[in-house]
Swiss-Prot record:
One of its GO terms (molecular function) is mRNA binding. This is Ubiquitin. The keyword Ubl conjugation applies. It comes from Triticum aestivum (Wheat). PANTHER family: UBIQUITIN (PTHR10666). Ubiquitin exists either covalently attached to another protein, or free (unanchored). When covalently bound, it is conjugated to target proteins via an isopeptide bond either as a monomer (monoubiquitin), a polymer linked via different Lys residues of the ubiquitin (polyubiquitin chains) or a linear polymer linked via the initiator Met of the ubiquitin (linear polyubiquitin chains). Polyubiquitin chains, when attached to a target protein, have different functions depending on the Lys residue of the ubiquitin that is linked: Lys-48-linked is involved in protein degradation via the proteasome. The keyword Membrane does not apply. GO terms for cellular component: cytoplasm; nucleus.
């Protein structure tokens, strides 16, 4: 299925995923497309930050859902 990931710059990335994919998998796909290391990615859906070990199905993310990508910069918290 296709999902969309919107970045803070307003760019939208289209990803091909399965419901059973983990958030880790999704971050790896974003890294492939955008070169952003997964440890710098925070994915938000429906106001919730998505945890790496969970699947898209756990969050009820369905086809053509839009996730929001926020970058976590190195350094301070």
């Amino acid at each position: 299925m296709q999902i969309f990931v919107k970045t803070l710059t307003g760019k939208t990335i289209t990803l091909e995923v399965e419901s059973s994919d983990t958030i880790d998998n999704v971050k790896a796909k974003i890294q492939d497309k955008e070169g952003i290391p997964p440890d710098q990615q925070r994915l938000i859906f429906a106001g919730k930050q998505l945890e790496d070990g969970r699947t898209l199905a756990d969050y009820n993310i369905q086809k053509e859902s839009t996730l929001h990508l926020v970058l976590r910069l190195r350094g301070g918290q």
